[in-house]
């Protein structure tokens, strides 16, 4: 057929989410992450037009263009679920290698909510050597495009000079010689980020850190305390400020753990005492309730007020945390492993596998990993392949249960575990995107909030 006589037929996307709230109509497509906001009255009128979408192009061409560009309406031949499955498989098979290393399970603090047993431990020279061999093995096979070395624990910076520095330098040099991208990250309590340490982070290609505060000063210092340190809160924030001044490349994810009846807005001014305005735009605030706290979705508005205050003081704020990689967890990836201090290899550090007598995997002396009972392949599961998930408009920004829970046979909807309503969080995100952009009609959520 001649192209000029070929008419494209359209259908509605299965992943359109339309929310009316406080005078606005919020339109969001969870597959494309595109959105727009209009008045509620106009939104009701436009929703009625969707009953005859193939006539919208002629009668309301500008509206049609917005819907088409945002993926709200799509050609009838497009199979969105096939797209999601393909993106999921691509994410699982990604050539970016995420190598987490735990030099120790010990820690200088003993936080009451911590899921880990802080046993005295340190990675041996033999395990360090085997990790180097593992890196050599990865690069020699020429199957990875990036190596992300991430430090975890315990408290990894207890052994900066002995383990982190030499192993990072080795990995960095090997990747440079192989033409493979490389960078480092770390989850730490921040206590050992001394002036000497932070002065070396750029050379080691550290780009991101996650550090946790346990509420405002008085609460944090009840949870984290150490002999000879009057305030761990003050000490860690000084270290953070020094680190961000020593390196222009580092982004800090500052997680704020909270209990509903203990978090107050005082924490903002307390943090401001130590963090100078010129580096606040490289700190992303991520509030999280401690996992033992009961879910209370009505508490979101209290946290929202706190986030607004942080934003007004120059910090980045995590307004919404959708899955953007088409997997529910990084452990879902084929190329993700966590190597414990003793050479045991796991896929999840948030469960008891680190302490199991039968390790899920073991790092061999030749640098390869031997998995027990195809343990690694079980983590490449498709936990969204069930009727509830496949029929959910939020599938592309959720992607189902965490692999561990899926393997254990759990079937709950993980949204029930969130401390906020999906709609409240999405509205807050879109509102702030519009507040910060004069032309928000073309916004998409990939820019972050």
Residues of each region from the PLM?
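Short amphipathic alpha-helical recognition elements used for nucleic-acid or partner binding
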Residues: 37-53
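Conserved glycine-rich "GG(E/T)P / GGGxP" loop and the immediately following alpha-helix
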Residues: 100, 104, 117-285
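Detector for the c-type heme attachment site
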Residues: 114-119, 393-397
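Flexible mid-to-C-terminal extensions adjoining Fe-S/redox cofactors in radical SAM and related proteins
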Residues: 355-449
């Amino acid at each position: 057929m001649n192209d000029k006589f070929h008419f494209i037929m359209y259908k509605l996307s299965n992943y359109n989410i339309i929310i009316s709230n406080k005078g606005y109509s919020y339109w969001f497509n969870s597959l494309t992450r595109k959105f727009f906001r209009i008045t509620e009255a106009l939104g009701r009128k436009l929703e009625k037009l969707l009953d005859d979408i193939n006539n919208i192009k002629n009668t309301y061409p500008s509206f049609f263009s917005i819907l088409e560009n945002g993926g709200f309406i799509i050609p009838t031949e497009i199979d969105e679920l096939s797209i999601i499955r393909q993106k999921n498989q691509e994410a699982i098979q990604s050539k970016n290698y995420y190598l987490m290393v735990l030099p120790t399970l010990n820690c200088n603090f003993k936080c009451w909510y911590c899921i880990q047993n802080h046993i005295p431990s340190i990675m041996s020279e033999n395990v360090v050597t085997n990790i180097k061999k593992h890196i050599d093995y990865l690069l020699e096979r020429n199957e990875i495009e990036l190596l992300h070395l991430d430090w975890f624990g315990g408290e990894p910076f207890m052994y900066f000079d002995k383990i982190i520095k030499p192993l990072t330098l080795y990995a960095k040099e090997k990747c440079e010689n192989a033409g493979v991208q490389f960078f480092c990250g770390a989850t730490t309590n921040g206590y050992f980020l001394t002036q000497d340490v932070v002065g070396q982070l750029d050379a080691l290609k550290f780009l991101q850190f996650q550090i946790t505060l346990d509420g405002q000063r008085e609460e944090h210092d009840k949870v984290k305390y150490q002999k000879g340190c009057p305030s761990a809160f003050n000490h860690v924030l000084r270290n953070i400020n020094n680190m961000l001044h020593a390196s222009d490349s580092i982004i800090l994810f500052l997680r704020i753990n909270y209990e509903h009846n203990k978090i107050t807005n005082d924490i903002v001014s307390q943090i401001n005492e130590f963090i100078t305005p010129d580096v606040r735009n490289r700190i992303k605030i991520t509030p999280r309730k401690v996992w033992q706290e009961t879910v209370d979705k009505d508490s979101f508005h209290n946290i929202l007020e706190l986030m607004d205050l942080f934003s007004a003081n120059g910090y980045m704020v995590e307004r919404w945390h959708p899955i953007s990689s088409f997997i529910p967890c990084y452990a879902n990836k084929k190329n993700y492993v966590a190597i414990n201090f003793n050479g045991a290899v796991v896929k999840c550090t948030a469960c008891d596998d680190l302490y199991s007598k039968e390790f899920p995997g073991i790092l061999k002396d030749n640098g390869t990993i031997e998995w027990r009972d195809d343990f690694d392949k079980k983590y490449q599961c498709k936990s969204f392949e069930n009727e509830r998930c496949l029929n959910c408009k939020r599938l592309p920004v959720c992607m189902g249960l965490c692999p561990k829970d899926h393997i254990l046979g759990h079937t709950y909807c993980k949204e029930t575990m969130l401390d906020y309503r999906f709609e409240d969080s999405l509205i807050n995100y879109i509102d702030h995107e519009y507040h910060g952009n004069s032309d928000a009609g073309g916004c998409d959520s990939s820019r972050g909030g």
